[in-house]
């Protein structure tokens, strides 16, 4: 006779002691759950501050565990960068329980509104300028290639908007946006110097072997040979930003994929689909149509080495917002987008107010 004992989720956390981690971090409310992790809001009983706790319970593979540990390492290393421009949640702690069967990561709890929620509640109330300001802020926060890291899963559910005003003329821009969930992030540079047993090397060797990120954001190079010379892995996230910009302009998704087969089929005619959809944004963008069409074409290029960097696209959005750059000449748009930072045909009023343009 077989006796089955049913243990529900609440009992599991109580029985394992996961309600209080490290005698400090108390889990209060489950807020998210994905294929490889579960998230909780809680409280740090040492400081009394609200926290976010991410758990990986019985990782299904060494690759999954490596991704989790790599996210913790990346966030821990952001302390200095966040002191200048805050873009990621502040790291508090991470570790493992039960000989690595459960991994945990503790960060601050970010108070704000997910971009996915903002789109549902505010898209049709917001003007195009207000939506482009959101795009500018997100582009600024999403660019991490200066640290040789790409996020690999940028979508509205991983982007938190802070309820604070943004100064477009400050010497040190703060985009008031926090990018969440770095579990898919990768640095090819770090991988090239890593030992085979290092987490970043395990992640690099596993690229393309399993897909756990959103189908919608996958760029055409998802299944390319990651070791081939000249791979522009640093522009992986630019594709996702192109899709987001299109959504912020039109309110629509450029593509709809339910499975990997649909994604693979779409790649056969992706360039024609993009050209057709982008050409029709004029009813949403009006006087800004030409410049926004050009920007979308430069972000949504199938060949990654020809794709625009996020930080350059951010600068283009800044010029549209601050300089009110709305050219009505196709040739001027083409010349401008070939070199936005060096474009000399316009006398800018405020260009030097964007200090990052000098760096990039």
Protein language model features and the residues they cover:
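Juxta-kinase regulatory segment immediately upstream of eukaryotic protein kinase catalytic domains
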Residues: 1-22
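Short beta-strand micro-motifs within the conserved protein kinase catalytic domain, predominantly
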Residues: 87-103
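Conserved short submotifs of the Hanks-type protein kinase catalytic core
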Residues: 99-114
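Activation segment signature within eukaryotic-like protein kinase domains
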Residues: 134-135
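Protein kinase catalytic-loop region centered on the HRD/HxD motif
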Residues: 140-149
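Activation segment/activation loop of eukaryotic-type protein kinase catalytic domains
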Residues: 162-213
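Regulatory extensions appended to serine/threonine kinase catalytic cores
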Residues: 324-360
């Amino acid at each position: 006779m077989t006796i089955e004992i049913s243990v529900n989720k609440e009992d599991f956390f109580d029985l394992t002691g996961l309600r209080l981690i490290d005698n400090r971090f108390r889990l209060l409310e489950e807020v998210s759950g994905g294929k490889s992790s579960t998230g909780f809001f809680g409280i740090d009983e040492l400081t009394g501050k609200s926290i976010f706790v991410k758990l990986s319970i019985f990782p299904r593979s060494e690759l999954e565990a490596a991704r989790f540990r790599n996210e913790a390492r990346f966030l821990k290393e952001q302390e200095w960068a966040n002191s200048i421009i805050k873009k990621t949640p502040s790291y508090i702690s991470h570790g493992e329980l039960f000989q690595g069967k459960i991994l945990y990561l503790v960060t601050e709890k970010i108070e704000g509104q997910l971009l996915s929620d903002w789109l549902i509640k505010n898209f049709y109330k917001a003007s195009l300028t207000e939506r482009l300001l959101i795009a500018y802020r997100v582009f600024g926060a999403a660019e991490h290639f200066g640290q040789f890291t790409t996020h690999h899963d940028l979508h509205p559910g991983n982007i938190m908007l802070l309820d604070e005003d943004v100064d477009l003329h400050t010497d040190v821009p703060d985009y008031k946006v926090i990018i969440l969930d770095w579990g898919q992030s990768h640095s090819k540079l770090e991988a090239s110097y890593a030992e085979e047993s290092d987490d970043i090397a395990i992640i690099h060797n596993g690229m393309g072997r399993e897909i756990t990120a959103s189908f919608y954001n996958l760029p055409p190079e998802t299944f390319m040979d990651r070791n081939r010379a000249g791979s522009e892995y640093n522009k992986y996230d630019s594709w996702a930003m192109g899709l987001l910009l299109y959504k912020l302009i039109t309110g629509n998704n450029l593509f709809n994929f339910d499975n990997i087969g649909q994604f693979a089929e779409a790649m056969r005619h992706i360039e024609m689909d993009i050209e057709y959809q982008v050409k029709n944004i004029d009813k949403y963008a009006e006087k800004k149509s030409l410049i926004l069409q050009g920007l979308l074409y430069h972000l949504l290029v199938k060949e990654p080495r020809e794709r625009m960097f996020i930080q350059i696209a951010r600068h283009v959005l800044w010029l549209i917002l601050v300089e009110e750059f709305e050219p009505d000449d196709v040739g001027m748009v083409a010349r401008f987008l070939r070199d936005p930072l060096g474009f000399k045909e316009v006398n800018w009023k405020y260009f030097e107010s964007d200090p990052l343009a000098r760096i990039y």
